[in-house]
């Protein structure tokens, strides 16, 4: 209908209700201003009109039909959801509508639904008019888990009160996370104080007996943490020394290898020189042997000749 317009209600906490509100589009409705009087038959038809099963009218009725809303059907075996509570609260609160609430625009209704703290001027009179009635239903359906200190606060506005409830009411997960963070901060401060007392060099250089004597009076967790740090530092020092020794040994082996390669080259050169000398001596020996054999032949031929002077002597 053109004259119907949804009125802002506090946002529910049920996921199903939030999904319903997110999927509901208010921009498709038009606002038509018309006088309140002169159409009593229209108000009667609105009171007698039946709504479909499972649907909830999100528009206010211009003329209140009854001061007491119709109570929903109750069944012992029926599980009442938060969405049904929302429907019942919405239908009961819309019975008392101020005439000023009809001068609204879709933008004002959207701003009221998304939870703006600055309410439109048209809604302020309506909200102050139904504050007490809405506070009664909110105490029945939504504020069962609120502490007594929070319930004692003055109720200025239903929407503001709901935001304050969500901001100030401590949840179990939030309290547990805050206590865990405080515990971790205390542990970190105590461990940092113990670790700052001893330097890394002192932890490594001290013996176990000296360390136990210095750790008297500390908690068990601090002692275990400090000993674990000392063990880590010693293992790190051992690893660094082993790495240094390994690198140094590698350099030494590489230097020895270079020297041995040079010595091998020198020995090869010496062998080649000796081989050349051997060949030269062998050639010289062969030449001497050939000369001796030729001289011996010449001497033998002269001794066999009878005409030589030596033959007669």
Curated annotation (Swiss-Prot):
Gene Ontology annotations of biological process type: regulation of DNA-templated transcription; regulation of myeloid cell differentiation; regulation of transcription by RNA polymerase II
GO cellular component terms listed in the entry, alphabetical order: nucleus
Main localization of the protein described in the UniProt heading: nucleus
Gene that encodes it: mafb
Annotated region described as Leucine-zipper, given as residue ranges: 253-274
Pfam annotation, one family: bZIP_Maf
UniProt-listed InterPro entries: bZIP (IPR004827), bZIP_Maf (IPR004826), bZIP_sf (IPR046347), Maf_TF_N (IPR013592), TF_DNA-bd_sf (IPR008917), Transcription_factor_Maf_fam (IPR024874)
GO molecular function: DNA-binding transcription factor activity, RNA polymerase II-specific; RNA polymerase II cis-regulatory region sequence-specific DNA binding
Family affiliation: Belongs to the bZIP family. Maf subfamily.
Biased composition (Low complexity): 55-76, 167-192
Protein's UniProt name: Transcription factor MafB
Subunit text: Homodimer or heterodimer with other bHLH-Zip transcription factors. Binds DNA as a homodimer or a heterodimer.
UniProt keyword list: Activator, DNA-binding, Nucleus, Repressor, Transcription, Transcription regulation
Range of residues in the leader sequence: none
Region (Basic motif): 225-250
CDD domains assigned: bZIP_Maf_large
Protein's job: Acts as a transcriptional activator or repressor. Implicated in the regulation of cell-type specific gene expression and play a role in inductive events during lens development.
Disordered: annotated segments: 51-77, 151-197, 292-313
Compartment annotation: Nucleus
Domain annotation bZIP: ranges: 225-288
Ranges of biased composition (kind: Basic residues): 154-166
């Amino acid at each position: 209908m053109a004259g119907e317009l949804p009125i802002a209600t506090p946002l529910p906490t049920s996921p199903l209700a939030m999904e319903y509100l997110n999927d509901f589009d208010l921009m498709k409705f038009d606002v038509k201003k018309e006088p309140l009087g002169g159409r009593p038959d229209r108000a009667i038809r609105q009171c007698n009109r039946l709504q479909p099963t499972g649907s909830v009218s999100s528009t206010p009725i211009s003329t209140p039909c009854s001061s007491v809303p119709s109570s929903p059907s109750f069944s012992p075996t029926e599980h009442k959801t938060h969405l049904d509570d929302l429907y019942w609260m919405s239908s009961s609160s819309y019975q008392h509508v101020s005439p000023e609430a009809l001068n609204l625009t879709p933008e004002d209704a959207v701003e009221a639904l998304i939870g703006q703290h600055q309410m439109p001027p048209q809604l302020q009179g309506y909200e102050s008019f139904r504050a007490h009635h809405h506070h009664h239903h909110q105490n029945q359906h939504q504020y069962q888990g609120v502490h007594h200190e929070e319930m004692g606060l003055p109720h200025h506005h239903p929407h503001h009160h709901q935001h304050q409830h969500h901001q100030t009411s401590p949840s179990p997960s939030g309290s547990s996370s805050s206590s865990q963070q405080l515990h971790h901060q205390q542990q970190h401060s105590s461990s940092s104080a113990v670790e700052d007392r001893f330097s890394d060099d002192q932890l490594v250089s001290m013996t176990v007996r000296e360390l136990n004597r210095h750790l008297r009076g500390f908690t068990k967790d601090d002692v275990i943490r400090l000993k674990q740090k000392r063990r880590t530092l010693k293992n790190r020092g051992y690893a660094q020394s082993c790495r240094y020794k390994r690198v140094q040994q590698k350099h030494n082996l590489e230097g020895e290898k270079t020297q041995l390669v040079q010595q091998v080259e020198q020995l090869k050169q010496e062998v080649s020189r000796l081989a050349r000398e051997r060949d030269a001596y062998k050639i010289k020996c062969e030449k001497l042997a050939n000369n001796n054999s030729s001289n011996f032949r010449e001497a033998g031929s002269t001794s066999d000749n009878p005409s030589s002077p030596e033959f007669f002597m």
